[in-house]
Amino acid sequence: MRTRFYNARVLTMKDFDIFLGEVWVEDNKIIYVGKVKDSSFCFDREIDVQKNLIMPGFINAHTHSGMTFLRSMADDMPLQQWLNEKVFPIETKLSEEDIYYFSKLAILEYLTSGITTNFDMYLNPEAIIKASLDMKYRTVLCGAVNDFCLSVEDVERCFNEYNQENSLISYVLGFSHEYTNSKEKIQQVAALSHKYKAPVYTHLSETEYEVNTCKEKTGLSPVEYLCDLGVYDYGGGAFHCVHMSEHDLDLFKEKHLNIVTNPASNLKLASGIAPIQAMLQKKINICLGTDGPASNNCLDMFREMFLATGLAKYKNCDASAVDAYEVLKMATINGAKALNLNCGVLEAGKLADLIILDLHQPNMQPIHNIAKNIVYSGSKSNVKCTMVNGEILYEDGHFYVGFEIDALYDEVQKRVERLMR
């Protein structure tokens, strides 16, 4: 399958220069990015982009797709109460099939937001993988070892199985939280990382309560504790990282770890504001994630981008902190770097994960600076087209995912009502 996008404003993300040109795709790879040129190629489809913007798709570097069933069911409470009173009890009722359908709903929402990859952590990886493959969507799974259900053996099996099967799916070692795992369990994950020389990810330093409890228990911050156990000897990183000391950040810099910030979720749960400017000053690779639809509650990278820069400016009392260019990198190329994916920029040889943003809408006019428009005034309504792995899955408000959308909504509602009984 060969697709030609022409008459396009092109933002490659290799830099922020935007030019009028073309992007050619063959099968799942980009084969040309540049100015208009003649070619003897025969294309299966040629798309006039009408001087709208074509750019790399967003990478949602932290989410829980299967939690769509909790959207607006448990709100207006802090993290620990939310988890212990609402989330954990109802999760015991979930079936693999439930998670499959709930994940499909999340993927639809990712597509409308221009998200072409998600880094997903939830209870049943098989269900999320099946949903992703059925919809031809790119997903990186993260192990979610904890003391209640998922074992280290489960994660090792998934790591070996799902890094071989399909180019749309990959699997990263991980565990849910420091406080939901015994020291022995975390040491087992670290041993697995050493065995495969593989990175590890987890939720980390999300709340003051978590940090203080870890210090009382171990005498160390969560970051120091995990480093002491050898968790990060082969890299990786963490989600949230809201309450980080200077020493914590130095450890992340020293070990070349990645941080995924989740501003909307951290605001809604009153967890705090991550010190993004301080992280950037230490040249830590920062990515952007929505967190799950239960704690956010929407899967919208435009909102995350605006909040990432806006909250950093507020926290530092500095209007120049964390500018639009830094945030766009967090949403694209930085996520690709953290997840070791061959995407995040538009250039020949990269995976054909790209989006078209509608510039012919009031919120994107006038065109002084398109990159800033995306971050400061862009919205999901500007997403005209989302291509994943060379296939258009969303275009002009229509999904091309192989099933009736309303039928999925009905199925999800039926399953949610069963869980609520």
Question: Could you describe each region identified by the protein language model?
Answer:
Residues 228-235, 277-360, 377-380:
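His/Asp/Glu-enriched, well-ordered alpha-helical/loop segment
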Residues 8, 23, 28, 51, ...:
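Divalent metal-coordination and catalytic microenvironments
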Residues 69-101, 135-143, 208-235, 255-258, ...:
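Active-site gating loops and adjacent loop-to-helix segments of metal-dependent hydrolytic enzymes
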Residues 71-137, 156-165, 412-421:
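Alpha-helical scaffold segments that flank or form the walls of functional sites
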Residues 127-245:
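Metal-coordinating catalytic core of metallo-dependent amide/deamination hydrolases
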Residues 1-21, 25-26, 31, 39-41, ...:
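Active-site microenvironment of metallo-dependent hydrolases
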Residues 208-220, 248-252, 270-279, 296-313:
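Histidine/acidic-residue-rich catalytic or RNA/ligand-binding cores of hydrolases
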